[in-house]
Amino acid sequence: MYSIEQFPPEADLETVPVLKKLNSAHRYLAELKGICRSIPNQGILINTLSLQEAKDSSEIENIITTHDELFRAGISASPSSPAIKEVQNYASALHCGFGLIQKHGMLTNNHILTIQAELEKNHAGFRKQSGTMLRNDRTGETVYTPPQHTDDIIRLMSRLEAFINDDNTEKPIDPLIRMVLLHHQFESIHPFYDGNGRTGRIINVLYLVLTGLLDIPVLYLSRYLVRNKSEYYRLLQHVRDTGEWEGWLLYMLEAVEQTAKDGIDTVQHIHQAMLDYKHRIRQNFSFYSQDLINHLFNHPYTKIDFLMKTLNVSRPSAAKYLDELTEGGFLHKEKIGRSNYYINIALMNILLPTD
């Protein structure tokens, strides 16, 4: 029987189907980690792919934006819609969390509070009032009541913090299984008034970095979860109702595998596009530099001011470079408001979903 107090669960987690799926998920995750190292500046992947994850993770919570709106807003000084701001907050919280684990080598409750504060733009902290219940969106029926008292929330989160940061030697559990378990436990504690789902999904990828399964946070599960949203919530609740973990484990490991495959494909395409741009720009333009290539792939959109700062060149020079690259078919020039923006055609084609 399921109990939130019994964590990690004592159930038999490593069934034959789970072990089979676990091996496959690890294989593709390791391949993703390796191929990310083919990009000279891995910050490019964090910047571009985190925007996709931010969009998809927010969509699970019914915060809907388009990729194009998001990319434009990322380089525009004009006010964004509330939905765009929510998505930008997610990307900012993800970057914040990655910085914290890089600096401290661990993920504490204080770090989780900081991530959630960056996400929600408030400092409400852990829930202090009772009354939080999880309901079926369609029927309004209460399907789960998380811990109601602050003392219980703090105690359970302290235990979860210890689980995240222990050395996993006393009763070793595979790190991917640990990630799946801690995600369920965090969602079940539901420690915040708002932002639990998105904070939990940030914790997932940070945990993979913390355990060395990835170097940078580029496994973004949310696109898979958006496509299979009803099953995600059904299996979360199925564990609580029955204490059976296998279905939840298989679902999340499949999410890891499929997302890793998508990530491998995306990174390979970005790598090839960078090599193509590098070769053709170096061949045809005297102003070629690796810094220029990195800049063009750091974000799908750029503008004169940004290139001036990156390359430390004058406004006329930056404008000349971008206009010549537009004439050469590398960029697409678009006027938005009073500013000209330059869109990396190859990168945009890679990042915009085709389905």
Task: State what each model feature region is.
Residues M1-D355:
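FIC/Doc superfamily catalytic core
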